[in-house]
Amino acid sequence: MSGLRPALSTFLFLLLITGGVYPLLTTALGQWWFPWQANGSLIREGDTVRGSALIGQNFTGNGYFHGRPSATAEMPYNPQASGGSNLAVSNPELDKQIAARVAALRAANPDASTSVPVELVTASASGLDNNITPQAAAWQIPRVAKARNLSVEQLTQLIAKYSQQPLVNYIGQPVVNIVELNLALDKLDE
């Protein structure tokens, strides 16, 4: 019985620190230093939320650039079911999925080069990836240009404008945020 009091007081102290002080402190610091990121990096047009800069969307129309496939459950890019497909490289089901995606992309992009960029046929680990390489976006230019009646040069400039360089050149590669790129495409039509 003599050991119960120190154990209980330690438990209550740690509960207060880890369950109260630490979460409140990190939330307050996040809201103070990074308010846009702490609130979901929401992309707004006026009072309307159009998406998040961190979560991809399922763009399927010919007039939009398509992102990486989503492996989330129930619906594509479901943030409540984030996760990869968990299919090993040796799994025949993964081969079938990739072959089907390649065939669909080639059918939708008949004027594109024959080699389909790998990120357009493989899902990311989170299933929510919103970025592709500028090369993968450029591969889709003929389809988008035809659907929107825009020039290849206009779309090339738009991809260059929305390309983001890595913080350190030798770590990572340039990427294009598909949500922001497609919203910019919609603004061109206005």
Curated annotation (Swiss-Prot):
Location, primary (coarse class): membrane
Protein name: Potassium-transporting ATPase KdpC subunit
Taxonomic source organism: Escherichia coli O7:K1 (strain IAI39 / ExPEC)
InterPro entries: KdpC (IPR003820)
Transmembrane segments: 10-30
CC terms in the record's Gene Ontology section: plasma membrane
Top-level lineage group: Bacteria
Function: Part of the high-affinity ATP-driven potassium transport (or Kdp) system, which catalyzes the hydrolysis of ATP coupled with the electrogenic transport of potassium into the cytoplasm. This subunit acts as a catalytic chaperone that increases the ATP-binding affinity of the ATP-hydrolyzing subunit KdpB by the formation of a transient KdpB/KdpC/ATP ternary complex.
Membrane-topology descriptor: Single-pass membrane protein
Localization: Cell inner membrane
